[in-house]
Amino acid sequence: MLPAEYDIAGKIVFITGAGRGIGKGIAQVLAEAGADIAINALTPRYVESTAAEIADATGRRIIPVIADVTKTDGVQHAVDTVMQAFDRIDVLVNNLGDAIRRPLVALPGKADAAAALSDDELKFVMDVNLTEAILCTRAVGPHMLERRSGKVINISSWTAGQGGGEMVVYTIAKTALVGFTRAQALEWASYGVQVNAIAPGIFPDPVTAGEERARQTSERAARIVPLGRAGQLREVGLLALYLASAASDYMTGQTIFLDGGMSL
């Protein structure tokens, strides 16, 4: 039996970008641990099927929240939906993220060089990896501060520790998310709200990338990750369980690299 501090039964969790991938993995574990969850995505077919799948498997109340959380009105709609359904938010997981593998500036002398990021692509990468977390934290924060209780978990990336080839803007956003985590944690520390981050390494998802690409990613991870394998989506959920529970009450402002040793 786990210590009581790990018990999150009855907690209300809001997870962005949770229709698939890491967000879905987090939702599955937290629901298994007894939490009721609002999972957000912009694509109805992913978020609705994921909500139904997790609800059927765990018996918990899982609701889909379809909204663009990179925009203020979308965030407000999402938070209003969660508050109407559950009356509170105990844990916010800012998981939304995406990368475009292109350089900031086209690299000369490379026959296969990718084109530089366009203005629209640059804005997209910053919005989904950083702006979303800021907007959602701003919207949920007043509810947590009023109750003097809450957990915010930001999902960063291993690239925040050492950069990522042809992913400069993505790295900028994920590194800024680490700074945001530290600054917001300090500002809210005296109000009983903890803010921490997880920086995942390589976690292939066949649903997101397709079976073949996920297999290739796993093979690459076996070569370059010190622990010799890619991560499993569930493993991010297990760490999120710790950060969502009272077991982590004395931790705030920290970023935990869950990357099989890639950041060493």
Predicted regions located by residue number:
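Active-site helix of classical SDR
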Residues: 137, 173, 181
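A glycine/serine/threonine-rich, flexible loop-to-helix segment
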Residues: 4, 52, 105-112, 190, ...
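Conserved mid-core segment of classical short-chain dehydrogenase/reductases
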Residues: 76, 84, 99-123, 146, ...
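Conserved glycine-rich cofactor-binding loop
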Residues: 12, 17-21
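C-terminal substrate-recognition "lid" of short-chain dehydrogenase/reductases
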Residues: 15, 149, 229-258, 263
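Alpha-helical segment proximal to the catalytic Tyr-Lys
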Residues: 142, 186-187, 249
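Catalytic Tyr-X3-Lys loop
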Residues: 98, 111-134, 149, 153, ...
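Short, small/polar-rich loop/turn modules that mediate ligand/substrate recognition or access, typified
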Residues: 189, 194, 251-253
